């Protein structure tokens, strides 16, 4: 259920874009992201920082898109969010306070150097996705960017999540690997 809630704003954005335009879709994205927060809080009685940051970014850049009637703002949102994720992960790792380890370390007991590898992998992933988004957003047609944002970045994120899980699994202590089988 929680994963479906995470994809709800993206699905609504895509559907509204296909039937209307980027401006109505941007407004729908703001509303859907707000709805996502309300439903998530109602069901789980807490909100993750990532959801709050995403909501703030969607609201700011979506509103700018609507006010100035310029789709560049909603396009930049993707790159800025990815840059913030990369920056947060990188800084946390440099301070030896890995965000990924704090999120998953209780369930997956792997060495600190493995968490560092995973963290830098995701820093690189987010940075590359942000740069590719700039290219696709400002060099290719709007329709291509919407498809890239909805399907391309989602698929790449899922693939990288699977790669990360396999990498972490490979480095789990043997007794913990047996528990997961």
From Swiss-Prot:
InterPro entries linked to this entry: YciB (IPR006008)
Transmembrane segments: 10-30, 50-70, 72-92, 118-138, 148-168
Superkingdom classification of source: Bacteria
Keywords: Cell inner membrane, Cell membrane, Membrane, Transmembrane, Transmembrane helix
Pfam families, A to Z: IspA
GO CC terms of this entry: plasma membrane
Entry's localization field: Cell inner membrane
Function: Plays a role in cell envelope biogenesis, maintenance of cell envelope integrity and membrane homeostasis.
Protein name, entry field: Inner membrane-spanning protein YciB
Species this chain originates from: Shewanella sp. (strain MR-7)
Species lineage: Bacteria, Pseudomonadati, Pseudomonadota, Gammaproteobacteria, Alteromonadales
Underlying gene: yciB
């Amino acid at each position: 259920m929680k994963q479906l809630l995470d994809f709800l704003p993206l699905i609504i954005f895509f559907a509204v874009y296909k039937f209307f335009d980027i401006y109505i879709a941007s407004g729908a994205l703001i509303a859907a992201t707000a709805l996502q927060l309300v439903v998530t809080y109602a069901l789980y009685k807490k909100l993750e920082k990532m959801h709050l940051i995403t909501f703030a970014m969607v609201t700011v850049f979506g509103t700018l898109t609507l006010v100035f009637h310029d789709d560049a703002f909603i396009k930049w949102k993707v790159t800025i969010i990815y840059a913030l994720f990369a920056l947060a992960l990188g800084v946390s790792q440099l301070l030896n306070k890995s965000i990924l380890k704090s999120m998953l370390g209780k369930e997956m007991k792997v060495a600190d150097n493995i968490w560092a590898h995973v963290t830098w992998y995701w820093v690189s992933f987010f940075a590359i996705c942000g740069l590719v988004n700039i290219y696709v957003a400002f060099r290719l047609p709007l329709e291509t960017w919407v498809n890239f944002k909805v399907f391309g970045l989602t698929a790449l994120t899922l693939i990288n999540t699977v790669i990360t899980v396999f990498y972490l699994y490979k480095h789990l202590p043997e007794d913990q690997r047996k528990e997961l089988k």
